[in-house]
C-alpha cells in the first residue's frame, strides 16, 4: 500500500493518506507514457507550414539556355528544385494532420503509470485542501518548498481555482500551477515533484474509475 503525507502551507504534516489503488499500477508502462506524450506533442503542431512546388514558383518559364551545344547539362526551367530560388521537392503542405489517436485504455494506463512512477521515486506529495491565503505571497510558496526540500521543477495541482495560490506560484520559475483536470501525462513526467491537493487526488480516482 502506498501512503503519502499531506502538508499545509507552512510545510507541516497534517495528515497521512493511503492512495487508492485505482490510481496506481503494479508496473510502470513506459510505452504507454511515450505514446501519450507523443500524441500530446503532435497535437500542438498547427500544420500551417507550406512550401512552393516547382509549378508554384513565379518566373522562370523560359528555358535557361538552348538544349545543345553549350557543354552543360540540359535544363528546362530555373524553377527546378536544384536551382537557388526554385521549387521545393516533396516539401510540406498545410493539409497535413499530425494528430495521432491514443485510445482511452492506453491513455488511462499512461496517467496511472506516471503517478506510480512519481510515487515510487518519492516525488509525489500531498497538500491539504484548506490552503487559503489572504493575498498572493510568493514568499509563502518559496518557504513551503524550502521546508519540503524541493528545489527543482514543481507541479502544484489544485482541486479548484485558487487565484492567490496561482499568483503565488507564478513568480517562481521552477513552479507551475494547474487544476486537476488540466494535468497531462507530460506535466507529471516533466515535474521533479508533484504537490497535489487531497481533493484533486480524489477527483483523479473518480475519473479513472
Swiss-Prot record:
GO CC annotation: ribonucleoprotein complex; ribosome
InterPro entries, A to Z: Ribosomal_uL4, Ribosomal_uL4-like, Ribosomal_uL4_dom_sf
Keywords recorded for this protein, A-Z: Ribonucleoprotein, Ribosomal protein, RNA-binding, rRNA-binding
Region called Disordered, residue ranges: 50-78
A Pfam family reported for this protein in Swiss-Prot or TrEMBL: Ribosomal_L4
Keyword Iron: no
Biological-process GO terms, alphabetical: translation
Stated family: Belongs to the universal ribosomal protein uL4 family.
Assembly information from the UniProt record: Part of the 50S ribosomal subunit.
Task of the protein: One of the primary rRNA binding proteins, this protein initially binds near the 5'-end of the 23S rRNA. It is important during the early stages of 50S assembly. It makes multiple contacts with different domains of the 23S rRNA in the assembled 50S subunit and ribosome.
Name of the protein described by the UniProt record: Large ribosomal subunit protein uL4
Record organism: Mycoplasmoides gallisepticum (strain R(low / passage 15 / clone 2)) (Mycoplasma gallisepticum)
